A protein has these predicted regions:
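Single conserved hydrophobic/aromatic residue that forms the stacking wall/gate
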Residues: 2-8, 12, 244-245
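A post-motif C-terminal structural segment
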Residues: 14-243
Length: 246
């Protein structure tokens, strides 16, 4: 495991659950992939390896979903309801895929004596593959460059005939059909990019601007996420927190 590897090599390694909203409910299950019940050992291992979780990024928000939080008027904020990488785009089941629901699942597992594998801190991330992040909806340039770098590729405006011909050439080359949709007599790319958004940022309360100090902040879960706004927020919460700690 990562924890054993870290102990042996004295190298800091951590995993950060990514795009849980597109996991079809598999990210925060109440049993293992083998169908075994979650155990205290599993919960402890997951918390050692995964102290924080990504709650927002370009492929949607992983906070909550209208089906999970029907009384929350913001529950539909930047929802991507498709499974990551599915072709054609396929619905992703929300139960087990969103962080707020994972918190409740973790508390239930802990109450049952099986430990809490979902006691996460929060981060955001851009998930861009361009070496830069686009955090302003009014100045969004792309996530992966060649695939969504122009408005036609994202399905924001109709495809021109030249673009359709180019896509068909790629389809023939890679033996993969081009996914398009007809709206009011116009042809649009149907790639699921219309549910992407300009987001997000990870914020860490670190003692200094060094990699080690930032990683230690992740380990302490002294982090929060924004959808792109650069703000400084600090708050304190904990099971055993007292005034002397503050």
């Amino acid at each position: 495991t990562l924890s054993h590897s870290s102990a042996a090599s004295d190298v800091y390694k951590r995993q950060m659950p990514h795009n849980s909203n597109g996991s079809n409910g598999q990210m925060f299950e109440v049993e293992t992939f083998r169908g075994d019940p979650i155990s205290i050992e599993y919960a402890e291992k997951r918390m050692r390896n995964e102290p924080v979780v990504e709650v927002t990024q370009v492929k949607g928000t992983s906070d909550t979903h209208p089906l999970l939080s029907p009384d929350d008027e913001w529950a539909d904020f930047e929802i991507m309801d498709k499974r990551v990488g599915s072709r054609p785009p396929t619905y992703s089941m929300p139960q087990g895929g969103y962080v707020r629901d994972a918190y409740l699942r973790g508390l239930t597992l802990e109450w049952e004596g099986r430990g809490n594998p979902y006691k996460f801190g929060l981060i955001g991330s851009s998930d861009t593959h361009t070496g830069a992040g686009a955090f302003d909806e009014n100045n969004y340039w792309s996530k992966v460059g060649v695939l969504d770098g122009i408005d036609m590729s994202r399905g924001s405006v109709p495809l021109t005939q030249d673009r359709i011909d180019l896509l068909n050439q790629y389809a023939d080359l890679y033996d993969q059909p081009v996914s398009v949709q007809e709206i009011d007599g116009r042809t649009y790319a149907d790639v699921g990019f219309d549910q992407w958004s300009a987001s997000g940022l990870a914020v860490a309360w670190a003692e200094e601007n060094t990699r080690d100090s930032i990683f230690q902040a992740f380990k302490r879960k002294e982090t929060f996420a924004t959808t792109g706004t650069r703000m400084a927020v600090r708050f304190f919460a904990g099971y055993d927190l007292s005034l002397i700690h503050i």
